[in-house]
C-alpha cells in the first residue's frame, strides 16, 4: 500500500505548521531552486512558475483554521493523519503533492494562490492577468476531499471529463476552488482532484496518505505523457444553470466565504531565527536539523541562504557554510557509496 515514509510525514508536518505568509516565502525559495529564477513569479497573493510540461498544477496556501496545528499525529496502523487543532490538509495536502511531483524531476507549470478560503482572492487577482503559460493545455487543482473525485465545476467539456476519468477518477460536483476563476478567464479547462482529506473546515479533519499518494501517482502519469501527445482542452461553459452543480458566479459566495474572518496573526512572537536573529511567530519559521544534530529555525527570508534540499531523501538540511555545495544531507552522506551525482 502506498503511504508516507517517515521522511515524507516530516515534510508534510513542516508544510502544515507554517502560516500562509511563511509558506509563500518558503515556496518561492523552493521553486527558485528547482526552476530557473527568471521563470518564477510572485506577488502578495500568488506564485506561479513556468515549467516545460504544458499542464498547470494548482493549490492554495491558506486553511480555514485560526491557528496552525502544534500537534500532528499519524496513526500508522489506520494510515490516518490528524490534529486536535485542525489539520489544514485543505489545502496543505495539495501543496505537499505538488512539491513531491517537483522532487520527482517533473517540471509542470505551477500556481499557488492565497486566501482561497475567504473568497478566492489570489485566484481572482491572477485571473485578471493574461494567461502566463503560452502552451497551457489544461489545469489540475489538487484541492478536493475524498477518494477519486474529479470535479469540473462550470466547465462542460465532455472530452476533458472522459480523459480525466480514464486515469481512474469519477466525476462529482463541487462548489468552488481556484480554477473556478482561472478556467473561464483563461478559456482553459480545469479539474479538481481528490487528495484524501475528509471532514474539511473542522477540527475533525483528517488525511489518508494512501489516497494522497495514489493521486500523486496518477498525476505524474499524466505529466509523463510526451508533450506532443498531451491534448488541448478548452473551457466550455454550460449554456444553462444547474442549481447545486454550477459555481455561483455572483458575489454571494464570496460574502459567505468572508464570514470565516480568521486572524492568522494573533500568536505571541517567541522564536529566534538562526540566520538574522530576529523574533518571529512559531509558525513563521522553518525548522531544520542542523549540522550538530540540533533543530534550528530560519525565517522565510533566511531559508535560501541557509537551507538546501537533499536530492536523496528530499529533506531540508542546514548548509555547513555559505559556500557549501553539498546536495546530500549529512545522514545521506553517511550511507556507504552515497554519491551526489
Task: Report each predicted region and the residues it spans.
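Catalytic-core environment of secreted peptidases
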Residues: 48-89
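Short cysteine-rich clusters marking metal-coordination/redox-active sites
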Residues: 273-276, 299, 310-313, 329
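Acidic/histidine-rich catalytic neighborhood of metal-dependent amide-processing enzymes
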Residues: 64, 85-164, 171-172
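A non-catalytic alpha/beta surface segment that caps or lines the substrate-entry region
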Residues: 7-53
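His/Asp/Glu-rich mid-to-C-terminal helical/loop segments that flank catalytic regions of hydrolases
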Residues: 199-265
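Zn-dependent metallopeptidase/amidohydrolase metal-coordination segment
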Residues: 55, 65, 170-215
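Zinc-coordinating Cys/His ligand positions in small cysteine/histidine-rich zinc-finger domains
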Residues: 281, 298-302, 318, 329
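Short functional micro-motifs and their immediate structural scaffolds
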Residues: 281, 285, 307, 318-322, ...
Amino acid at each position: 500500500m502506498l503511504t508516507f515514509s517517515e521522511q515524507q510525514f516530516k515534510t508534510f508536518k513542516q508544510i502544515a505548521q507554517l502560516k500562509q505568509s511563511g509558506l509563500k516565502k518558503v515556496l518561492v525559495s523552493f521553486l527558485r531552486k528547482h526552476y530557473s529564477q527568471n521563470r518564477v513569479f510572485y506577488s502578495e497573493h500568488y506564485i506561479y512558475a513556468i515549467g516545460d510540461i504544458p499542464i498547470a498544477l494548482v493549490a492554495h496556501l491558506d486553511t480555514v483554521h485560526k491557528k496552525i496545528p502544534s500537534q500532528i499525529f499519524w496513526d500508522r496502523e489506520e494510515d490516518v493523519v490528524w490534529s486536535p487543532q485542525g489539520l489544514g490538509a485543505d489545502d496543505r495536502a495539495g501543496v505537499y503533492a505538488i512539491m513531491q511531483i517537483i522532487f520527482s524531476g517533473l517540471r509542470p507549470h505551477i500556481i499557488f494562490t492565497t486566501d482561497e478560503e475567504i473568497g478566492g482572492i489570489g485566484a481572482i487577482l491572477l485571473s485578471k492577468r493574461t494567461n502566463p503559460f503560452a502552451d497551457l493545455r489544461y489545469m489540475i487543482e489538487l484541492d478536493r476531499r475524498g477518494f477519486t473525485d474529479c470535479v469540473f465545476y462550470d466547465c462542460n467539456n465532455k472530452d476533458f471529463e472522459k480523459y480525466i476519468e480514464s486515469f481512474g477518477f469519477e466525476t462529482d460536483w463541487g462548489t468552488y476552488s481556484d480554477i473556478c476563476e482561472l478556467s473561464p478567464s483563461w478559456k482553459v479547462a480545469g479539474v479538481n482532484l481528490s487528495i484524501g482529506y475528509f471532514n474539511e473546515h473542522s477540527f475533525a479533519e483528517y488525511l489518508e496518505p494512501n489516497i494522497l499518494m495514489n493521486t500523486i501517482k496518477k498525476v505524474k502519469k499524466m505529466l509523463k505523457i510526451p508533450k506532443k501527445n498531451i491534448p488541448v482542452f478548452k473551457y466550455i461553459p454550460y449554456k444553462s444553470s444547474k442549481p447545486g452543480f454550477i459555481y455561483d458566479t455572483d458575489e454571494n459566495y464570496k460574502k459567505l466565504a468572508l464570514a470565516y474572518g480568521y486572524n492568522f496573526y494573533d500568536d505571541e512572537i517567541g522564536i529566534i531565527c538562526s540566520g538574522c536573529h530576529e523574533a518571529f511567530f512559531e509558525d513563521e519559521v522553518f525548522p531544520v536539523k542542523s549540522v550538530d544534530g540540533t533543530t534550528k529555525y530560519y525565517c522565510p527570508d533566511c531559508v535560501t541562504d541557509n537551507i538546501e534540499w537533499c536530492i536523496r531523501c528530499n529533506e531540508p538540511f542546514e548548509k555547513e557554510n555559505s559556500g557549501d555545495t553539498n546536495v546530500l544531507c549529512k545522514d545521506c552522506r553517511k550511507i556507504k557509496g552515497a554519491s551526489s551525482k
